């Protein structure tokens, strides 16, 4: 090959390489421009689309780095918009309840630093469930645990842990409270925390970790609330609060809260005579609560809360198999759906039930006199027919030889329906077990199932002789 041919060949190869490089640079430029404009296409509205005025919470904002031929391109992944919960799905159809969680707090207290608690409950955010309880400002193996049978002291605080995690020393103290309720509106937690003097207590409303509002006692007689979850629909949360006599006429009010601020207060109306410690659940578009009549009735009051116009109605569960303790035996107990049955109304215990068409699912202590044992069952016609007593699908949760306590409901939203779950407080120590000076609890939790299930008993399980005095 002569020199001229070599020059021509080298020139051709160089031109080819230059052309390829030029085309690659054009491709990189096009890719860069395309990705730059795509990152602004996340949920961008049409020019004539009206955007909502409420704030939008960005849950995550991730930047992805892509390396192309020494050129850096940043691509922003579309942020996820968090919305208020509306609970519009139907209620799950169930055959009974299956075990879900048990924290074994008392057994663990025999050899570890576990809080002394009572009044536990469970509530869930859209992704995870949490257990709450009112701590006594002390662990069990501590002299401060003496005489913790008392309900209202200034050292009590609301504790919060992931469900199944006992209240250890690292547990978060959410607020100061000897009575409480908590719920998640889809964006943040609301905590209602009552503390202070019996005759002049304060309820603090804490939303997203900030104190947003408060209200003082209106009857100067132990302002108190649900001891279980409140309910939020489309950004409005509702909670039932009572101030007044525990064994006579009291003043119950239903509060409506938006992002921690009280927006309305409705008085109790309807036929319920006394209302405390309600267990509430969403019944879209409204909220329904099953409560404790501590005055006249061993049948449980029902409160229906209209979330649109703030109107309130109340009545009583129709089932003649009544849910409170103490109560008459099942042969002689009664309920006419509208009024208290005037059967062993005082004192009572927190409990739950929920409607299922004309029927009702409910839980109660097995003993008619004491807080011992726990059972669940369905009463045919128990929601619509006065004094109905046809019971099916009975399950023993805690056998009659073991202590129980308060119980309450919480709701869990699935892909197709809303499931109902409940917890049972398993009280140990005083006043029933006088070998020790403390009073505390563990919990067991069950959820509705459409499947089959077996039998068993899930008591607290601690040997009182192994426990610190």
Curated annotation (Swiss-Prot):
**What cofactor(s) does the depicted protein rely on?**
Ca(2+)
Q: What is any Pfam family matched here?
A: Neur
Glycosylated residues: list them.
61, 69-70, 86, 146, 200, 234, 402
Annotated residues for binding of Ca(2+): 293, 297, 324
Q: How does it get modified post-translation?
A: N-glycosylated.
Q: How does the protein's chain sit in the membrane according to the entry?
A: Single-pass type II membrane protein
Segments for region (Hypervariable stalk region): 36-88
Bridged cysteine pairs (disulfide)? 92-417, 124-129, 183-230, 232-237, 278-291, 280-289, 318-337, 421-447
The record's subcellular location field reads: Virion membrane; Host apical cell membrane
Question: Which UniProt keyword terms apply here?
Answer: Calcium, Disulfide bond, Glycoprotein, Glycosidase, Host cell membrane, Host membrane, Hydrolase, Membrane, Metal-binding, Signal-anchor, Transmembrane, Transmembrane helix, Virion
InterPro entries, sorted? Glyco_hydro_34 (IPR001860), Sialidase_Influenza_A/B (IPR033654), Sialidase_sf (IPR036278)
**Intravirion side of membrane:** 1-9
Q: Name one GO cellular component term.
A: membrane
Q: Where is this region: Involved in apical transport and lipid raft association?
A: 11-33
Q: Domains: what does the record tell us? A: Intact N-terminus is essential for virion morphogenesis. Possesses two apical sorting signals, one in the ectodomain, which is likely to be a glycan, and the other in the transmembrane domain. The transmembrane domain also plays a role in lipid raft association.
Family recorded in the similarity comment: Belongs to the glycosyl hydrolase 34 family.
Q: What does this protein do?
A: Catalyzes the removal of terminal sialic acid residues from viral and cellular glycoconjugates. Cleaves off the terminal sialic acids on the glycosylated HA during virus budding to facilitate virus release. Additionally helps virus spread through the circulation by further removing sialic acids from the cell surface. These cleavages prevent self-aggregation and ensure the efficient spread of the progeny virus from cell to cell. Otherwise, infection would be limited to one round of replication.
Give the protein's recorded name.
Neuraminidase
Source species: Influenza A virus (strain A/Korea/426/1968 H2N2)
Its taxonomic path starts at: Viruses, Riboviria, Orthornavirae, Negarnaviricota, Polyploviricotina
The gene name reads NA
């Amino acid at each position: 090959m002569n020199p001229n041919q070599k020059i021509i060949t080298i020139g051709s190869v160089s031109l080819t390489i230059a052309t390829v490089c030029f085309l690659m640079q054009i491709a990189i430029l096009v890719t860069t421009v395309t990705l730059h404009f795509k990152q602004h296409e996340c949920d961008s509205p049409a020019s004539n689309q009206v955007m909502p005025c409420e704030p939008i919470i960005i849950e995550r904002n991730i930047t992805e780095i892509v390396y192309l031929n020494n050129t850096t391109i940043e691509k922003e992944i579309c942020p996820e918009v968090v919305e208020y919960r509306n609970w519009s799905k139907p209620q799950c159809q169930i055959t009974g309840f299956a075990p879900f969680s048990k924290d074994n707090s008392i057994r663990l207290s025999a050899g570890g630093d576990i809080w002394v608690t009572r009044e536990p409950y469970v509530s869930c955010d859209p992704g995870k469930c949490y257990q709450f309880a009112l701590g006594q400002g002390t662990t069990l193996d501590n002299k401060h645990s003496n005489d913790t049978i008392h309900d209202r002291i200034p050292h009590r605080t609301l504790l919060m842990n992931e469900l199944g995690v006992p209240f250890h020393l690292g547990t978060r103290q959410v607020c100061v409270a000897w009575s409480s309720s908590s719920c998640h509106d889809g964006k943040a937690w609301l905590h209602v925390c009552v503390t202070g003097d019996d005759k002049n207590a304060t309820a603090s409303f804490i939303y997203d970790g900030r104190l947003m509002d408060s209200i003082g006692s209106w009857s100067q007689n132990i302002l108190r609330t649900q001891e279980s979850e409140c309910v939020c629909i489309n950004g409005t949360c509702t909670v039932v609060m009572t101030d007044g006599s525990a064994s006579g006429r009291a003043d119950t009010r239903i509060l409506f809260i938006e992002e921690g601020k009280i927006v309305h207060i409705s008085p109790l109306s309807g036929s319920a005579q006394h209302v405390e410690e309600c267990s509430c659940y969403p019944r879209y578009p409204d909220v329904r609560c099953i409560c404790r009549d501590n005055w006249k009735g061993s049948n449980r009051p029902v409160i229906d809360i209209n979330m649109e116009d703030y109107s309130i109605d109340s009545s009583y569960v129709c089932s003649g198999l009544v849910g409170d303790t103490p109560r008459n035996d099942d042969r002689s107990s009664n309920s006419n759906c509208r009024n208290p049955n005037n059967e062993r109304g005082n004192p009572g215990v927190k409990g739950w039930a929920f409607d299922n068409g004309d029927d009702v699912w409910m839980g109660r202590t097995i003993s008619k006199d004491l807080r011992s044992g726990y059972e669940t069952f369905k009463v045919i016609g128990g929601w619509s027919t006065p004094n109905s007593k046809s019971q099916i699908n009975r399950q023993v949760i805690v056998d009659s030889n073991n202590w129980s306590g308060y119980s309450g409901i919480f709701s869990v939203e699935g892909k197709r329906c809303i499931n109902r779950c409940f917890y049972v407080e398993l009280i140990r120590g005083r006043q029933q077990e006088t070998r020790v000076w403390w009073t505390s609890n563990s919990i067991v939790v069950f959820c509705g199932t459409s499947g089959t299930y077996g039998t068993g008993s899930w008591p607290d399980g601690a040997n009182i002789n192994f426990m610190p005095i």
